[in-house]
Swiss-Prot record:
Glycans are attached at N91. Disulfide bonds join C120-C131, C148-C241, C220-C233. This is C-type lectin domain family 7 member A. The chain crosses the membrane at residues 45-65. The lineage of its organism: Eukaryota, Metazoa, Chordata, Craniata, Vertebrata. InterPro entries: C-type_lectin-like (IPR001304), C-type_lectin-like/link_sf (IPR016186), CLEC7A (IPR042808), CTDL_fold (IPR016187), NKR-like_CTLD (IPR033992).
């Protein structure tokens, strides 16, 4: 069988022209394009990772910046609080009291030149309208009386049960000592008298006797802890001086 070329397919030189189907070429191109999408690198994942890293770095930078600002302020505050007195503490601080002073009811102090000051000498205790000195010196009753007089005071005169409670509370803290008070009598047969000459009333407290055959005339009075006794006036003992003042 002889091949007869189609004259329409001959070119100028007499060669036959070949025509391929364009649809197959298009299909190949599409497939290759789709294949390139599947085989493309994971750039989206890389972009997400880089974004997260940037966010973490930003958060760290903010935290470090906040700490850098806070530390100088806190250091300055600690210096002010640690080495300089607080004005609030100066305004609201109150003077401390000794245990002996805390056990009594405080009284109003006298104002002098705008400053509160005590109306009592040092080592004396204020109670109500009097100053009290619990002297540790061991003297006879007469010697204790003279000592109080030299200090511008007298051996204590107990006028009320409230004052008695105050005295008992003070001397109870010194259970090894007894204290002379301003109560005596010239002889056993006469009533007890205070230093100012007033008569003692047994309604206030009772005086326990220490009279014996060897010591029949204890004509002075002292207090030991919470009990009041008569005693020989010559026995050395501590004493309580009292000085009254006007408010």
């Amino acid at each position: 069988m002889e091949y007869h070329p189609d004259l329409e397919n001959l070119d100028e030189d007499g060669y036959t022209q070949l025509h391929f189907d364009s649809r197959s070429n298009t299909r190949i191109a599409v497939v290759s394009e789709k294949g390139s999408c599947v085989a493309s690198p994971p750039w989206r994942l890389i972009a997400v990772i880089l974004g997260i890293l940037c966010l973490v770095i930003l958060v760290i930078a903010v935290v470090l910046g906040t700490m850098a600002i806070w530390r100088p302020n806190s250091g300055r505050n600690s210096l002010e609080n640690g080495y300089f007195p607080s004005r609030n503490k100066e305004n609201h601080s109150q003077p401390t009291q000794s245990p002996l002073e805390e056990s009594v009811t405080p009284t109003k102090a006298v104002k002098t030149t705008g400053v509160l000051s005590s109306p009592c000498p040092p080592n004396w205790i204020i109670y109500e309208k009097s100053c009290y000195l619990f002297s540790p010196s061991l003297n006879s009753w007469d010697q204790s009386k003279r000592q109080c007089s030299q200090l511008g005071s007298n051996l204590i005169k107990i006028d009320s049960s409230k004052e008695l409670g105050f005295i008992v509370k003070q001397v109870s803290s010194q259970p090894d000592n007894s204290f002379w008070i301003g109560l005596s009598r010239p002889q056993t047969e006469v009533p007890w008298l205070w230093e100012d000459g007033s008569t003692f009333s047994s309604n206030l407290f009772q005086i326990r006797t220490t009279a014996t055959q060897e010591n029949p005339s204890p004509n002075c009075v002292w207090i030991h802890v919470s009990v009041i006794y008569d005693q020989l006036c010559s026995v050395p003992s501590c004493s309580i001086c009292e000085k009254k003042f006007s408010m």
